[in-house]
Amino acid sequence: MDGANMNAQVGYTSPGYLNADVCHLNLHKTFSIPHGGGGPGMGPIGVKKHLIPYLPTHPYTEKPNSTSLGTLTHSEFGSASILSISYAYIALLGKAGVRKSTAYAILNANYLMKRLQPYFKIFCIEGKERCSHEFILDLTGLKKSTGVSE
């Protein structure tokens, strides 16, 4: 499961509850860490127990078993220091606050979608009145009328 943006799920469900075998939680989109400016976004990768033997290992603490891919990076600790930002964000909000943040993400996305819908085509909502935490605008008309290109 792509957990790059968990804004519509945090506090309400989880990748495990949805029966995902693997989920990468990219922290910059959901838990307030900066993206870029020192490296790519990062975050934990959660797996179900049956996949643990296939996980990569750390070069200084573990020896690869026969099914592991071994070490996949030369960065000893990755961007571990950035995890303190997400930890503080979650700790300060608490369980109720994290859930409320999810509700606001969904509310804000739907508010903006409704405000922009008269002016832009919205992709992937055919027959639906609401979106989850995001929506995709078709900017083809704007690009043609202004000459702005990618």
Residue ranges and their predicted role:
Residues 1-67, 144-148:
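Conserved PLP-enzyme active-site core in the AAT-like
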